[in-house]
Amino acid sequence: MAADKVDPIHQFHIIKLVPINIGGYDLSFTNSALFMVATVVVAAAFLFLTTSSRSLVPGRLQSISEMAYEFVANMLRDAAGTQGMKFFPLVFSLFMFVLVANLLGLFPYFFTVTSHIIVTFGLAILVIGTVIVYGFMKHGLGFLKLFVPKGVPLVMMVLVVPIEVISFVSRPISLSVRLFANMLAGHITLKVFSGFVVSLSALGAVGVAGSILPLAMAVALTALELLVAFLQAYVFAVLTCMYLNDALHPSH
């Protein structure tokens, strides 16, 4: 148990809460699944409770909800134009899910679902899948113009087209790894400094004095992680908007 408290990786372990095995497939309900459900419930409850009154003079919480709505709406309009607003429910849902999941992960003993690559990759595949499906539905084979930039000489197409295809295919990887790596690294660093504080404090008066610097670093890192939680949600959402713009306007 003592090792678990110091081990910075222990916080990312998947724990089976309700073992479920169907046809040889492990479909157990885990701590990761629990906090994904909690993330959806918290985000939905916050938005419902803060906007249900629809007061002409909004309170603080209602103002936060309206600011989040306008923030994402403006982001989507800037990246994909007014046509992009048809994707607002998707982008806003992704933004709120990533933001709330990141924030919940900062609470002690809570699980950070966005620190697992399988979760972030699933979100990225949802985005890229939407781009591909909508792109072909709207433009047919014209969607393939996305891989043929305008103004490129014909002789260069042999080189440019494969590069564009590889760039497109790598999008879900870069989108998911960026979020996963930032959350993983931040939480490990925070856990390490917190472990220093606990370990030094157990050494008596000298240890307590020596723990002041790690404690200050832990507090500063916590504040930084709050900023990172928002920035990563913003980056994920803004890149989603840019990718959706390719589905709307595949011609460069």
UniProtKB/Swiss-Prot annotation:
It holds the Pfam family ATP-synt_A. Belongs to the ATPase A chain family. F-type ATPases have 2 components, CF(1) - the catalytic core - and CF(0) - the membrane proton channel. CF(1) has five subunits: alpha(3), beta(3), gamma(1), delta(1), epsilon(1). CF(0) has three main subunits: a(1), b(2) and c(9-12). The alpha and beta chains form an alternating ring which encloses part of the gamma chain. CF(1) is attached to CF(0) by a central stalk formed by the gamma and epsilon chains, while a peripheral stalk is formed by the delta and b chains. The gene is atpB. GO terms for cellular component: plasma membrane; proton-transporting ATP synthase complex. InterPro entries: ATP_synth_F0_asu, ATP_synth_F0_asu_AS, ATP_synth_F0_asu_bact/mt, F0_ATP_A_sf. Its main location: membrane. It comes from Mesorhizobium japonicum (strain LMG 29417 / CECT 9101 / MAFF 303099). Keywords: ATP synthesis, Cell inner membrane, Cell membrane, CF(0), Hydrogen ion transport, Ion transport, Membrane, Transmembrane, Transmembrane helix, Transport. The chain crosses the membrane at residues 29-49, 87-107, 117-137, 146-166, 188-208, 211-231. Key component of the proton channel; it plays a direct role in the translocation of protons across the membrane. It is found in: Cell inner membrane. This is ATP synthase subunit a. It comes from the Bacteria. It is a multi-pass membrane protein.
